[in-house]
């Protein structure tokens, strides 16, 4: 029997792992043990990619093998999340609903970092008395953190005139400080805080409740979308105090008709597209020498797995791109572009293929 080469062995193991990862996306389980399993698979996936690069292998299953330092960093992050979830699974919160979005890396790193967070509402802060100079921040419904004694505890965030905070081990911990934000976005060192339809003055404080809560899925999408928002788009974000981040570099303009608690607009602003996500995903709104396409947008790891699995549906599409992203956008979020010979073929594809809930679908047309 012929012995497998290192590349063949690693390719086989990677394929099996990525099939299991995609199963997690498709099943969309809501128990904590499933999320622990998911992050273990992500760790093993990056361990394989790390090993491949050590052997000088630059491609596995048509997938580019990233540099060693990237695979190492991703593996360490996966271990961090896996260990945190294992600890949480031993707490009294283990029977709560835990989804991939609740335990994703983006929310874990969002302030307050190294905490799990669920739900959230928006607090609007207006600088210089100017309604057009507004920034928005998340007041989390639930923050899960490790106490000084190593026990997982749960609390709700509160908002005061001075910032957004939570009580940790009896101490007030601010994860957004409005004075620091005012130094970045204002000129007169004055600001107004509006939360839940109320204006909060220097002596007031309000805590998060269950009314008008934004889900973790919506928050993640808003965090992903924030880096591409224009100044007229009010995005939900929680920038670190004293640190400027690309997602919140410029003040947003806030209008009375803006929807802060609804699903984020998933339009991909691409001159090649004539339509995008809408109530009628398959409605053609342009004409000319175009071909039907869809954009699949989501986490790069899930897209790589999805691209691999789509090979068995090759009869239902014409071409599929590698994973790509817009310059300046969130590097963890990618896009796959799939082209079709006709609208009929595209409709069949959408009927036959199961797309994970974590992947956004944008339907359109592209000039050839």
Curated annotation (Swiss-Prot):
KW Ubl conjugation (keyword) present: yes
Ranges annotated as biased composition (Polar residues): 227-236
Record's subcellular location: Host nucleus
Chief place of localization: host cell
Any Pfam family: PPV_E2_C
Region (Transactivation domain): 1-207
Alphabetically ordered keywords of this record: Activator, DNA replication, DNA-binding, Early protein, Host nucleus, Isopeptide bond, Phosphoprotein, Repressor, Transcription, Transcription regulation, Ubl conjugation
One of the record's GO molecular function terms: DNA binding
InterPro entries per the UniProt record, alphabetical: E2/EBNA1_C_sf, Nucleotide-bd_a/b_plait_sf, Papillomavirus_E2_C, PPV_E2_N, Reg_prot_E2, Regulatory_protein_E2_N, Regulatory_protein_E2_N_1, Regulatory_protein_E2_N_2
Gene Ontology cellular component annotations, sorted alphabetically: host cell nucleus
Location of the region described as Disordered in the Swiss-Prot/TrEMBL record: 227-251
Numbered residues of crosslink Glycyl lysine isopeptide (Lys-Gly) (interchain with G-Cter in SUMO): 297
DNA-binding domain: annotated span: 290-368
Any GO BP annotation: DNA-templated transcription
PTM comment, free text: Phosphorylated. Sumoylation plays a regulatory role in E2 transcriptional activity.
Keyword RNA-binding recorded: no
Membership in a protein family: Belongs to the papillomaviridae E2 protein family.
Role summary: Plays a role in the initiation of viral DNA replication. A dimer of E2 interacts with a dimer of E1 in order to improve specificity of E1 DNA binding activity. Once the complex recognizes and binds DNA at specific sites, the E2 dimer is removed from DNA. E2 also regulates viral transcription through binding to the E2RE response element (5'-ACCNNNNNNGGT-3') present in multiple copies in the regulatory regions of the viral genome. Activates or represses transcription depending on E2RE's position with regards to proximal promoter elements including the TATA-box.
Quaternary structure (record): Binds DNA as homodimer. Interacts with protein E1; this interaction greatly increases E1 DNA-binding activity. Interacts with protein L1; this interaction enhances E2-dependent replication and transcription activation. Interacts with protein L2; this interaction inhibits E2 transcriptional activity but not DNA replication function E2. Interacts with protein E7; this interaction inhibits E7 oncogenic activity. Interacts with host TAF1; this interaction modulates E2-dependent transcriptional regulation. Interacts with host BRD4; this interaction mediates E2 transcriptional activation function.
Protein name from the UniProt record: Regulatory protein E2
Organism of this sequence: Human papillomavirus 45
Lineage, broadest ranks: Viruses, Monodnaviria, Shotokuvirae, Cossaviricota, Papovaviricetes
Gene this chain is encoded by: E2
